[in-house]
Amino acid sequence: MQYWAETVESLYRQLGSGPGGLTAEEAARRLRESGPNELRGSRPLSRLDVASRQLRSPLLLLLIFAALASALSGEFVDATIVVAIVIATVGIGYSREYSAQRAAAALRAQLHVRTTVLRDGVPGPVPIEDIVSGDVVRLGAGSLVPADAVVLAATDFYVSEAALTGESFPTSKLPGVVDAAAGLAERTNCVFLGTNVRSGTATCLVVTTGGATEFGSIAKRLTLRPPETEFDRGIRRFGYLLTTAMLVMVLLVFVGHMFRGRPPVETLLFSVALAVGLSPELLPAILSINLARGAQVMARHGVLVRRLNAIENLGSMDILCTDKTGTITEGVVQLEGAYDAQGQPSDRTLELGAWNAALETGISSPLDDAIGQARMPDLAGITKLGEMPFDFMRKRITVALKEGDGVRLISKGAFHHVLEICTQMAPAVPLDDRLRAALETLYEAWAARGIRVLAVATRTIVMQDSFSREDEREMTFTGFLTFIDRPREGVARAISDLANLGVSIKLITGDSRLVAQHVASLVGLGADHVLTGRQLDELHDEALWREAERTDIFAEVDPNQKERIILALKKMGHVVGFLGDGVNDAPAMHAADTSLSVQQAVDVAREAADFVLLERGLHVIKRGIEEGRRTFANTLKYILITTSANLGNMVSMAVASLFLPFLPLTAGQILLNNFLSDVPAVGIADDNLDDEMVKRPRRWDIRFIGRYMVEFGILSTAFDFLTFGLLLGIFHVAPDAFRTSWFVESLLTELVVALVMRTRRPFYRSRPGRLLLYSTGVLIPIAFAMPYLPFAPVFGLVPLPASLLVAIAGIAMLYVLATELQKVWFYRHD
């Protein structure tokens, strides 16, 4: 249906709706039939989805292929061992990841976005996912457009369609009918899912929902993925590093074994086992557990996580950009006074401001609420004829009231933006340069004391059918409304705490330079370097990159300038966070590395945010940053411990296999060893963290990871060859006893050395997490007992003499000491 070319009456008829919308019963029926108003991919992962994610691992698929090859060649024992290892690995990964996904989904469910919908003719909030075709919705500035709809009525209604059409400027939307051949950008009588309202108000009739929308049709053709975070890029680069090392080693071993005439199936199994042994195959599960745990801890501290992968970005953040209202200040605005153009108390100014505040529509402003608390106007006999809503270019709002046979216009807004439409000053004095300078002096005196100022102007015109922004001219400047918003208690301490964490605060505000400087000075923020929106416009990009770093306060800026500031800071290598709650903050939030909003924010700001704060305040963000760093540190801890130990063992095994007349470990033994050593590693997600690990922002450093792997891997290889010398040169063991001894030694050293490598401190001065400590404590005796267990022969393990076990224990203790010394040297030269 080409609904944009249909009349409203025709649409009502085809959709079975009307001006009062649907009945609640009919809406429920349609929801059952059409399903929720969601796009493909927006629903939480099912059990089957999580299980399939485990099986999509290339390494596990390689193992399954190797098991199949073994079975076809008659090696059923080897095939069974490999399949058992695959099932156990998938089981652990599935159980932990599914529980993590459920926990994260439960937290996100607390953040339902609702839209005002007419049901049974009565407006009320309805979750966006419950909207159906035929619903009549009301939208205002800051609203997300919940579905594709036709505009029924609108007042100065502008919609940002950048996400759909690429057009950066908001588009005016009006009721009417357009040509059936009109393209998407030409359908000025329609609004579309995925866009948001920048200004004005409208009533719209929903035509299509979910996958049937214009945005949904794009989603069907594309795999829509969220933007790659810094953490995602780090994981990807680490994957490239590991894959390169793995391919080189496996190819060399495979070619070497084939050259020596080893059986092809045995060579294939051994090579695949080496590849699996080198990889941290539980990394996806560790990531999910880490992120979900981080989200749960952050929720307990008042931060809801909307995008799990952004947690590490929050920990890496070194600059936080924020407005002052509600974050630096209490956000409880009080009317300080109402004054005439001479700066004297004025009841008339308050009366006009109260009428304007009470009759305007759109976003509820704390300033308007403060006016209403000071003066609740008597609207009896007042007839509103029209409105020119607030927008972020004009920074004012004008209402038109019937007054006798004429019309009174009342404008209220930012001082300079109201002054620019005035030609005289109350009572009826022409505004010359001298009077404008006097008004400017009054304004600056209040602003220098941190007092916010709105100006009020009025004009009487003849009756007319409609009103527009062109009527905002030749106004009479009536007076000032002044407001106070005191600094939040404890904010100076929170700013200091963030500075101690390596995070600097930059104020980005639409308020005046003087107000911003005054507030910043009260709470201990830098206020020496200030850049105004007008000055910012005069800077080319490269100049702004340098200037942004040294600037403490960006004042009198518009939404596009906020975004430009964020991009400039990122260009200088910073990880930038942005805290916003208004419709004008959305572009900057999308540009930031990590974005935060508050529960009371407009829809578009909450949807743009990675994190939603349940209460305002920098102290809440501090907790989130610390948890982000804990999550990152424990993930990196698993990678460093696992890959360095695995690299050392696999290099030892690869080299030994080329020179020994037998395999140093069978494929089944390699896989069992790798599986058992990974079990305690799951506990790293809940491991304790040394305080110094959260003191500074941390970012991915692939060179650091590579150096760590090589240096500690070499140490591991050295002790492996020490073990080989002991087994062959002193104990003269047979091949089965050699494999069993090295299996026990390799498993034992991986278990105990994890307790050493998990901390930069001496290991005895850093307490491990309970799960890591207990699981390691259980597996150490199991490692010694493995050769004597009933299933040991299945894996080719044989009993060992007590003297050999004592020697292995001695090597493990010596390895712990050497690792501790190597750790001190490594971090001293890092």
Segment roles from a protein language model:
Residues 61-81, 241-279, 292, 296-302, ...:
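Helix-interface capping motifs at the ends of transmembrane segments in multi-pass membrane proteins
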Residues 253, 284, 527-578, 592-762, ...:
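Membrane-embedded transport module
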Residues 190-196, 313-476, 483, 496-497, ...:
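Cytosolic catalytic regions of ATP/NTP-dependent phosphoryl-transfer enzymes
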Residues 34-68, 101, 122-124, 181-190, ...:
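Soluble-to-membrane junctions at the N-terminal ends of transmembrane alpha-helices
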Residues 158, 165, 175, 330-350, ...:
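Basic, amphipathic juxtamembrane/active-site segments
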Residues 492-494, 500, 512-523, 560-568, ...:
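Acidic, divalent-metal-coordinating active-site segment for phosphoryl/phosphodiester hydrolysis
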Residues 73, 77, 81-112, 119, ...:
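Hydrophobic alpha-helical transmembrane segments
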Residues 1-132, 137-145, 150-158, 162-169, ...:
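Non-lumenal N-terminal regulatory segments of integral membrane proteins
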